[in-house]
């Protein structure tokens, strides 16, 4: 598959100067950095393309070769590995530019600990009010016996003879030499002769740790809380990964939630719907009174401002929307049936259409529909 044009990747013209190249690179690298897009393979691929484009265009010799020969200038040539002496060193191009944004450089991040994810389920009440939860997570932590070296003792650690302790070797690629991790020591620069008998040379051991997580008020399903440095410990003193707490809200028996707003259904009697009245409705802060006007129909929404959920981002409160449902009476005795029949008969008089305007409109429409069909 053809590789993308480096200038297009960075969104710059072919006449862009060094300042424009660096500015565009910082902006795009910040946007697609893996730390900001954990688990997003598309962003990771884009980040690698951006980094590759910058490494070429920020170097005057590489840029000149690319302008003349395109990607062919960097097709693999001889692949002889050498120690880290002589030739151009491009290993810190990325670290120098990006270190001030995220800290550290590529070498220090090579052994960075893995990020962890923990799913936590909350009640709606806890999500709305906020809560502190204790969680217990399995993780890899630095071995206390060898302090993360993986060796039985300091004397059991020797310098790698392939890379002479640098952790990297140079590879010939096209017109230039580029660096990669040493295949002998895997980038560590040192080799362990005798492994620690507790972590068996890994430098880390499995254990569980308990953390207190502060859940802010207003969180919702899908929100994530990042605990920096609480993931797995890094290797050989590299930084630890992060812990991402994923929020899931349990279904509530009364309320449904949509962003900041809460919804609930409130049953009212046939007589209250017709005559009006006052009822108590539930809120997360307790019961409140709601006035029902006469002639209320099923499905009417009543908005109670500020009785919803506080936004975790804007801070403002949402509303509670109560949808009334007119309940049909059941298990009627003879007296009640007779009274309802009398009421129904009264609707059949000359003014009955006034009592059910929607029914009249509906059936008038049905009649017109069938009349039109028979013409």
UniProtKB/Swiss-Prot annotation:
Query: Which Cys pairs are S-S linked?
Result: none
**Start and end of every J domain?**
5-70
- Name the keywords, alphabetized: Chaperone, Cytoplasm, DNA replication, Metal-binding, Repeat, Stress response, Zinc, Zinc-finger
The zinc fingers classed as CR-type run over 130-208
- Residues the entry annotates as binding Zn(2+) 1: 143, 146, 196, 199
Residues at which Zn(2+) 2 binds? 160, 163, 182, 185
Q: Name one GO molecular function term.
A: heat shock protein binding
> Any keyword Repeat?
yes
Task: State the needed cofactors, names only.
Answer: Zn(2+)
Superkingdom assignment: Bacteria
An example Gene Ontology CC term for this record:
cytoplasm
* Any one biological process term the GO annotation gives: protein refolding
Q: Where is this protein localized, as stated in its record? A: Cytoplasm
Coiled coil: which residue ranges? none
**What's noted on cofactor binding?**
Binds 2 Zn(2+) ions per monomer.
Q: Which regions are annotated as CXXCXGXG motif repeats?
A: 143-150, 160-167, 182-189, 196-203
**Chief place where the protein resides:** cytoplasm
**Gene3D superfamilies of this UniProt entry?**
DnaJ domain, Heat shock protein DnaJ, cysteine-rich domain, Urease metallochaperone UreE, N-terminal domain
Q: What does this protein do?
A: Participates actively in the response to hyperosmotic and heat shock by preventing the aggregation of stress-denatured proteins and by disaggregating proteins, also in an autonomous, DnaK-independent fashion. Unfolded proteins bind initially to DnaJ; upon interaction with the DnaJ-bound protein, DnaK hydrolyzes its bound ATP, resulting in the formation of a stable complex. GrpE releases ADP from DnaK; ATP binding to DnaK triggers the release of the substrate protein, thus completing the reaction cycle.
| Similarity comment text for this entry | Belongs to the DnaJ family.
Domain comment from the record reads as follows: The J domain is necessary and sufficient to stimulate DnaK ATPase activity. Zinc center 1 plays an important role in the autonomous, DnaK-independent chaperone activity of DnaJ. Zinc center 2 is essential for interaction with DnaK and for DnaJ activity.
Quaternary structure, per UniProt, is:
Homodimer.
From the Swiss-Prot or TrEMBL record, give the protein name: Chaperone protein DnaJ
Q: What organism is listed for this UniProt entry?
A: Blochmanniella pennsylvanica (strain BPEN)
The gene designation is: dnaJ
